Structures are given as structure tokens and as C-alpha cells.
Amino acid sequence: MTQYGGPIVQGSAGVRIGAPTGVACSVCPGGMTSGNPVNPLLGAKVLPGETDLALPGPLPFILSRTYSSYRTRTPAPVGVFGPGWKAPSDIRLQLRDDALVLNDNGGRSIHFEPLLPGEAVYSRSESMWLVRGGKAAQPDGHTLARLWGALPPDIRLSPHLYLATNSAQGPWWILGWSERVPGAEDVLPAPLPPYRVLTGLADRFGRTLTYRREAAGDLAGEITGVTDGAGREFRLVLTTQAQRAEEARTSSLSSSDSSRPLSASAFPDTLPGTEYGPDRGIRLSAVWLMHDPAYPESLPAAPLVRYTYTEAGELLAVYDRSNTQVRAFTYDAQHPGRMV
């Protein structure tokens, strides 16, 4: 992880932290590349980070993408850019009885030993700390003592939160859980999920960036809003596979170039499973700036960035705020998510 939320690009290609064998479980897409580019260790096609949105300011919201065709054996669910793609917010910590598995935003699975409340572990190969909440202060002289002290008390003291950083200067990546509306059949209080997701960032000056996740419905758990360190508010427009299929069929019916309407088989309402992890079919369609304290009356009338997808849910094209196509991608029809 970089200071601004990019993928991990330093350290080993893959590692089990705390394990005596140091068995690599996947590779870092931002690491060694050559050719098209292809990672020479596994022959996986990779694309280094591409930034679609970055406004200046303290602890800004930076939206970027990285791609790797490599499939880890312990994948996180497919993210909002489709199979193979990762966004800075695509960080997930799996809580297991015998291990903590961090699915980073570079497509890797990094294994740690379980942590007790307040315990911290440092990975020399990744130059990264992973800390479990539950302690008011770190010992005097500890590398993270000042950075830990800058966190709000409710974060520091919660044993249910995990935090990661790659620098004593910060920022912290806060790994929590998304609130949800309980169902009528749920037993209350509902147990916490066996994983943690990125809920925000905090820097050494006490500034925060917050991800707002949906609490109910088809988009439950997904990020639909962001407030950055400058107080700007962004709305993330998400679509389901069924919504995109209906839009495609409606567009086909109204198009003068179409001799017959688009069939359900050509653009299905649901997506089949892939080797890239479970896929709910939810994709990021556009990002809007909804509030800017510095320019409250000068908000843009168009999205800052827009995305389109194939019938298989693969990222097809990227458009900037002038609606100009700035990137396009093609994929292997026989292997969903594999870029060509």
C-alpha cells in the first residue's frame, strides 16, 4: 500500500507472514513486469495502476485501478471493476481460526498469524504493519506510538477493528465492517462477519477519509459514498448485472441499427462464476462530486468519470468528465476476465 492508497508494490512477490516456510501464495501485479506486460514469475498479464480521479487536498479520494490475470487460491470477491481488476478500496481481511488473510488491492493474499486485542505485527518483506484494536496506547518508543495516539479513541479501543499502515507517518487503513439492516429472522445482536473491509483512512493529523457502504438491498456492503479529508463528498453510482442487461435490451429495441432485440442469453441477468472469486455482478458506473466546501456553487454537471462493461461484467471502457473515451479493453471470450 502506498501513502495515497495505491497497491503494494514493494517487497516479495508473495509471502505468508509468520510462517516458517515463507510459501508464496500469489504475486504482486505491480512488481516485475516485461513485455505486454506479463509477470515473468507466473505468466500473468498485469497492468500497473491507472488513476481515473485525483483531486488535490489533504487525504484526498484517489480512484485508481490495477489489473492482474493471476488467480490466487484464496481470492476475495470480484470488485466493482470486474474480474481481474482491483481498486484501492478492494482490501479485505479474512478472519480465520488459524490465520488472518489480507487480500490486498494488488490481487495478492498475504497470510498473518492471528492477533490478540492490541497486538501488532510487522512484515519486513512488505514494510507493513497490521495492528488489532483494543489498546489505548502503544508502548513508549514504539514505532507506531505517535501514529496510534492520533487515532480517535473509539477506533483504538475496539478489538473488532484492524488497522494497517506501511509507514510511521501514516495513513492508517481502517478495516471494519459495513452496517446492515437486520432481517426479521435474524437473532440480535447479530454476530460480526468473519471478515473486515476498508471503512476509511486516518492520517497522523487526525484527518479522516470515510467510505459509506449500503446497509440494505442489492448493494448491501458496497461503497456508494466517500467523504475525503477536505470535506468533499462523492457519490458512487453502482449497477447490478440485471440493470445493465435491462438497459442493453432497452437500447437494442430503440436502436435503428438493430434488426432484432437483444436476447437474454446475449446479455444475461446474472453472471456465471469465474476463477477470480465470487461475483455479485455489481459494478461502478460513475462517480459524481456532490459537495465541495471550497466551491459549493460550482459543482460539475457531469460525472467526474464513467465506466461501461461487457455482457460478462468485464470493464470495457473508461470516459473522463468531458465524456471522452480514454481507455478501452478486450477480453478472451472463452475465459471471462482474462484480458488480451
Segments from the language model and where they lie:
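Amphipathic alpha-helical interaction segments
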Residues: N36-V38, P75, S89, L93, ...
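Short, polar loop/linker segments at the starts of domains and inter-domain junctions
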Residues: T72-K86
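Generic recognition of flexible, low-complexity loop/linker segments
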Residues: G49-T51, D90, L304, L316
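Solvent-exposed loop and beta-edge segments used for protein-protein assembly and interaction
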Residues: L55-G57, Q94-R96, R156-S158
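Extended charged/polar low-complexity repeat regions
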Residues: G5-V9, G14, P29, F81-P83, ...
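Intrinsically disordered, low-complexity segments enriched in small residues
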Residues: M1-P75
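Short alpha-helical segments and helix-capping/turn motifs at coil-helix boundaries
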Residues: K45-E50, K86-P88, Q94-D98
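N-terminal targeting and processing segments
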Residues: R65-T66, A87-D90, Y122
